[in-house]
UniProtKB/Swiss-Prot annotation:
It comes from Acinetobacter baumannii (strain ATCC 17978 / DSM 105126 / CIP 53.77 / LMG 1025 / NCDC KC755 / 5377). PANTHER family: URIDYLATE KINASE, URIDYLATE KINASE PUMPKIN, CHLOROPLASTIC. GO terms for cellular component: cytosol. This is Uridylate kinase. ATP binds at K15, L16, S17, G18, G58, R62, T166, Y172, D175. One of its GO terms (biological process) is 'de novo' CTP biosynthetic process.
């Protein structure tokens, strides 16, 4: 009898940036990218992996320029960004439901009948019942990034691994799109990331993962099979641990 290969991680938190959802577009959601992401996530669900997702909003709203021009304040700009993540979350939820994946959309901000309010207890229950949970509106507070929200949600739902999906295949010592001699790291410690200012995630996010000993994996979501490889425990991207 053939040996059944089981996923290494039973519950994960996947961070999808808004830029990842835009594909090759400057702004907006690339339908093909969204469809491929939903397929990759559906594969994990089929293997019994419990999946939580945090989505960013940079593909729909970037507030830095408006703030620089003095048109909106920082708090308002961050709130606009939170609402952008809700739109991305709605798209991701429907893409998953279209594949017959039961999905919950949970917001850190109360938004009436559009999205249910986030509760870690409810999220864990939904995940345990095989539903995917898409978390939107960041932490619900200004001044915190969606990377920080991803690490916070990952800790709250007791995820075995936090995955950051990017457009590059891991962490490099410098920008590989600008420098041909950029070197990729296969493994890093959280302290290395902080000391070398590698820009994997912001300081708060990295410290959360380090202090709660939750490993982080950075990988290229656009690479076919990469998400599955990470969850199966295969070598893919860059792994960051304590």
């Amino acid at each position: 009898m053939a040996e059944t290969i089981s996923p290494r991680y039973s519950r994960i938190l996947l961070k999808l940036s808004g830029e990842a959802l835009s594909g090759n577009k400057d702004m907006g959601i690339d339908a093909q990218v969204l469809d491929q992401m939903s397929l990759s996530i559906a594969h994990l669900v089929g293997l019994g992996v419990q999946v939580g997702i945090v989505v960013g909003g940079g593909n729909l709203y970037r507030g830095s320029q408006l703030q620089k021009d003095g048109l909106v304040g920082r708090v308002t700009g961050d709130q606009m960004g939170m609402l952008a993540t809700v739109m991305n979350g709605l798209a991701m939820r429907d893409a998953l439901v279209r594949r017959n994946i039961r999905t919950r959309l949970m917001s850190a901000l109360p938004i009436g009948t559009v999205v249910e309010s986030y509760s870690s207890r409810d999220a864990i229950r939904h995940l345990s019942q095989g539903e995917v949970c898409v978390f939107v509106a960041g932490t619900g507070n200004p001044f915190f990034t969606t990377d920080t929200a991803a690490c916070l949600r990952g800790i709250e739902i007791e995820a075995n691994l936090i995955l950051k999906a990017t457009k590059v295949d891991g962490v490099y010592n410098k920008d590989p799109s600008k420098y041909e001699d950029a070197v990729k790291y296969d493994h890093l410690t959280f302290d290395q990331v902080l000391d070398e200012k590698l820009g994997v995630m912001d300081l708060t996010a990295i410290c959360l993962c380090r202090d709660h000993n939750v490993p982080l994996q950075v990988f290229d979501m656009n690479k076919s099979g990469a998400l599955l490889s990470v969850v199966m425990g295969e070598k893919e991207g860059t792994r960051v641990t304590k």
